[in-house]
Amino acid sequence: MADLAKIEEQLSSLTLMQAAELVKMLEEKWGVSAAAPVPMAAASAPAAAEEAVAEKTDFEVVLTAVGGKKVEVIKVVREITGLGLIEAKKLVDEAPKAVKQSVKKAEAEEIKSKLEAAGAKVELK
């Protein structure tokens, strides 16, 4: 252990030029390169991005069209969002409009089915 401490002390006292020279000498002696394998890291990044897109967890429920049963759609929007009558009517009148954002897939599917049962057309984004 004392030898390692001596080596560490000697390496710490090297100047930047001396350290660079030491690296070159060791590369030549051992036949290695001190360069980082950058291409490998760059190649794996797109695969990670594809996985993130495939595993979408938060959805936005968008009311695209009201259909013929506007009153029923307003009732369902009030139930889902907790909005008052005037706010829910305004949301329905402004379709296409997001009814709910950042919801899990199961909840988004449930909201979509309720709105479609009331006669609305809905998209999940």
UniProtKB/Swiss-Prot annotation:
Alphabetical GO biological process terms: translation
UniProt keyword list: Ribonucleoprotein, Ribosomal protein
GO molecular function: mRNA binding; structural constituent of ribosome
UniProt-listed Pfam families: Ribosomal_L12 (PF00542), Ribosomal_L12_N (PF16320)
Cellular component GO terms, alphabetical: cytoplasm; ribonucleoprotein complex; ribosome
Cited CDD domains: Ribosomal_L7_L12 (cd00387)
Superkingdom of this protein's organism: Bacteria
Record PANTHER family: 39S RIBOSOMAL PROTEIN L12, LARGE RIBOSOMAL SUBUNIT PROTEIN BL12M
Function: Forms part of the ribosomal stalk which helps the ribosome interact with GTP-bound translation factors. Is thus essential for accurate translation.
Record's subunit section: Homodimer. Part of the ribosomal stalk of the 50S ribosomal subunit. Forms a multimeric L10(L12)X complex, where L10 forms an elongated spine to which 2 to 4 L12 dimers bind in a sequential fashion. Binds GTP-bound translation factors.
Family to which this protein belongs: Belongs to the bacterial ribosomal protein bL12 family.
UniProt name for this protein: Large ribosomal subunit protein bL12
